[in-house]
Each structure stands twice: as C-alpha cells, then as structure tokens.
Amino acid sequence: MMRILLFLATNMAVMLVLGIILSVTGIAGNSTGGILIMALLFGFAGSLISLFLSKTMALRSVDGEVITQPRNQTERWLIDTVSRQAQKAGIPMPDVAIYHSPDVNAFATGATKSNSLVAVSTGLLNNMTEAEAEAVLAHEISHISNGDMVTMALLQGVLNTFVIFLSRVIATAVASSRNNNGEETRSSGIYFLVSMVLEMLFGVLASIIAMWFSRYREFRADAGSASLVGKEKMIMALQRLQQLHEPQNLEGSLNAFMINGKRSELFMSHPPLEKRIEALRNL
C-alpha cells in the first residue's frame, strides 16, 4: 500500500507542477499536435521520476536501515530468506531493510530488478511467525520478479498523457469559443481554470485505473508467493493480517463518505483479504 501511495503522490506532485507550467506559459496551447507531444513528454516525466526516486523516497519515508552486515539472528534470517527466494525467482539479490513501526507491513520497490529493495517493519517481525513472514517476503520478491514497479510507471505515464492531453484540448476549445465571442482578455484565465479542473477530474479517473491494476498485480504477487513457498503459507499470512487489521482503515475512511461495498474497492490498492485468500485456495 505504502509504495503505491508514495509513487502516486510523487507522480501527482510532478504532474501538478508541470501542468501549471504548461498552463501559465501556454506551451503548445493552440496546437493539438503540440499538446500531444508535450503531454507525452510531461506525462511520462512524472511517472519516470517517481520510479527512479522510489527506492530512496521509500527508505527515507520510513527511516529504514539497509542491512549491510547482519547483527543478529533475525537480520541473518531475513538476508538468507530473501537471498534464497531471489535465487529461486531468478532475480539479483535486492537490498533488504528493516524499519521501526508497529504496523505489520512490508514493501518492495526500485527502478529495476537489479536495483531493488525489500523492506519489512519490526511490527511484522514481532507479530508473524517465520512461515508467515517468509510468505510475505516471497510476495514482495514476486513484485520485483514481475517487474511491477516498471509496469506501473509505464501505465501511469500513459494515463498522465491522456489526462494532460484531454484536459488541454478541451480547455483550448472552451477558451477559443470565448475568443470567437470577442472575450479575448478572458481566454488565458479560462484556459488555466478549465485545464486545472479537468486535470483533477481526469486524474481521479486515472487513479481508479491505476488502483485496478494495483489490485490485479497483488493477486499475481500472491500467486508468485504460493509458487515460491507454497500457498498454505501465504494463506496463513493473509489470515494473520485479517486478525490484526480488520476492519481495514481504508474501508473505514471510505465508509465515512458513504462509499461502501464494491464501490470502495475502486480506491483500494489491494484487494480485500478474503478475496485474496479465496483466489489462493482456487490455485
């Protein structure tokens, strides 16, 4: 969950800055071809910057410490387990980090398979058995072997491009119609306002698509974990999460806005735990 939020937040920040630059400067403002070219350049800039900064940002956000030399049995077990799973998955050994948090959590990130990171919280190590933690680590290794961060970056780049392109094409049409009515002094202000509003609206739709893909890749990572360590261990890990985290915080916050049931899943980066368990049992 955290790695997705970090990625999307960075991407959104870059998109907002670039969008303001585009609107204020009027770059490619009247040319559909020019808008498309700039949308492609700026659209992928946000996602690629997020991708290449993901490892550094994730570590800093949790104040994680990469294990360079194991200092105790737990760190040795982590290194040995990740090394064994990475070898089985056919990927280079990722960096392994621990961060202090009561939350039961782990994440994988990094721009490439050869420059990746797996991090686990002390809460996970303290609340899960070795078998359960092993399954969680295998889940994160599967994210790396599947190239999920790169795929997410490419998808986000495409979505960014459409958001920028459509918002500015529509804004240009609205501003131009005002110009035809003789209100030329308002065109730049209207263009900026319309493009920003549409960018936010289309951005929400793009986020829904990105969250759908995130849920899809979680199912794939669960299946990857089952392949590496066996589905029973992954099921046990998910059942442990059910005991520790239900009701889910995200669902609770969405319920406060009267978004319930299947509609709430639109905004979730992970599928409901019961669906993940059911999918594993059906493997």
From Swiss-Prot:
Membrane topology: Multi-pass membrane protein
Transmembrane annotation, as ranges: 4-24, 33-53, 147-167, 190-210
Name of a matching Pfam family: Peptidase_M48
Keywords: Cell inner membrane, Cell membrane, Hydrolase, Membrane, Metal-binding, Metalloprotease, Protease, Stress response, Transmembrane, Transmembrane helix, Zinc
Keyword Hydrolase: yes
Annotated localization: Cell inner membrane
Gene3D superfamilies registered for this protein in UniProt: Metalloproteases ('zincins'), catalytic domain
Single GO MF annotation: zinc ion binding
CDD domains in alphabetical order: M48B_HtpX_like
Catalytic residues identified in the record: E140
Enzyme nomenclature, EC number: 3.4.24.-
Binding site for Zn(2+): H139, H143, E218
Cofactor note: Binds 1 zinc ion per subunit.
Example GO BP: proteolysis
Record family assignment: Belongs to the peptidase M48B family.
PANTHER family given in the database record: PROTEASE HTPX (PTHR43221:SF1)
Classification via HAMAP family: Pept_M48_protease_HtpX
Protein name: Protease HtpX
Organism per entry: Haemophilus influenzae (strain PittGG)
Gene (name only): htpX
